Regions:
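Mixed-charge interfacial surface used for oligomerization/domain docking
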Residues: 3, 11-32, 41, 84, ...
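N-terminal glycine-rich anion-binding loop in soluble enzyme alpha/beta folds
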Residues: 5-70
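Short beta-strand/turn micro-motifs composed of small residues
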Residues: 8, 89, 234
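Non-transmembrane, interaction-prone segments in cytosolic or luminal domains
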Residues: 50-53, 58-59, 79, 204-210, ...
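A general structural signal for short secondary-structure boundary/capping elements
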Residues: 51-57, 73-76, 132-136, 278-279
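Glycine-rich phosphate- or other oxyanion-binding loops that anchor nucleotides, phosphorylated ligands
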Residues: 55-92, 96-100, 146, 153
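Short beta-strand->loop
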Residues: 89-91, 114-117
């Protein structure tokens, strides 16, 4: 895609393989452990958890700064002066990144941005579908591309089941934490990204395997699902046995293609270890 270059935050969890395939550029977000702030991706999630355990702290995250974006935009422009940069942003309701990008875009008339209203694998799905559209429609205008992106966003469903709610509570990203009630050890909630925000929508009880299946059932009951593909996601520590079971279960439900993504440092800092997520889509 020579005419357009898509830029995303590292919290989108677009894989290195997909970035290379579509020429997507990732801008690192930030993870803070105690007094130390590092770029997302510079240490893996397991090390984040290990350091937090060692120092007795919880991880915190922050978005990309205007300087982070300006550096990337200038580098792309120097390498591809005729390219138009499209920033498909991590949910604006959860971080400053989109605002930072708009500040960085001032005086750079080749940069356009929009809020995807998603994070992690939900944002990744929106981004990759947009990249495919651009590849198939190289002469599309920015308005046409963003109209397509909006149509994808309207069909994406994103949710996950954490096993340790302390990460969500400390991170302050959950918009309705009171919904969970007091007996946190007895439940595993379904956290969905709705209108760009993390919202607890349902409570599951039982083993993680039982809850993961109930969670998938809950997600596919939301409308007329496109069974050609489902994206599944996990944070470090989720057992291979459960992942294998959920892949078989997804196929049993009728999904033809099942892909897996291990989430990076930013989302791992919110959902904690051993979390399970899914991103099905509604039919167009």
């Amino acid at each position: 895609m020579g005419k357009y270059v898509i830029v995303v935050e590292s919290g989108s969890d677009v894989t290195p393989e997909l970035c290379e395939r579509y020429g997507i550029v990732r801008v690192p977000m930030h993870v803070t452990i105690g007094d130390e702030t590092v770029e997302d991706g510079s240490i893996d999630p397991l090390e984040i958890y290990s350091r937090c355990n060692e120092f007795g702290v919880m991880p915190k995250t922050s978005g990309c700064s205007p300087a982070d974006f300006a550096h990337v935009y200038d580098r792309i422009h120097a390498e591809q002066p005729d390219a138009t940069i499209l920033h498909l942003a991590y949910s604006e309701a959860t971080t400053c990144s989109h605002q930072s990008s708009k500040i960085a875009a001032q005086g750079r008339d080749y940069v356009f941005s929009m809020d995807t209203r998603f994070v992690s694998v939900g944002q990744s799905l929106v981004v990759v579908e947009t990249a495919k559209y651009i590849e198939a429609h190289p002469d599309a205008t920015v308005d046409e591309i963003f109209a397509f992106t909006n149509s994808v966003m309207d069909r994406v469903l994103l949710g996950f089941v954490p096993t340790d709610l302390a990460f969500l509570k400390v991170g302050g990203r959950l918009s309705n934490v009171a919904f969970l009630g007091a007996h946190l050890l007895k439940i595993k909630p379904c956290i969905e990204v709705t209108g760009g925000k993390f919202v607890a929508t349902k409570k599951f009880r039982g083993s993680m395997l039982k809850c993961a299946r109930a969670f998938i059932d809950h997600m596919v009951a939301k409308g007329e699902i496109d069974y050609s593909h489902i994206g599944l996601a996990y944070s470090v520590g989720l057992s291979q046995e459960l992942r294998d079971d959920m892949e078989v279960y997804a196929h049993d439900l009728g999904f033809k293609d099942v892909t897996w993504t291990q989430v990076g440092g930013v989302i791992s800092s919110h959902c904690g270890p051993t979390a399970f997520g899914a991103v099905p889509t509604l039919k167009a």
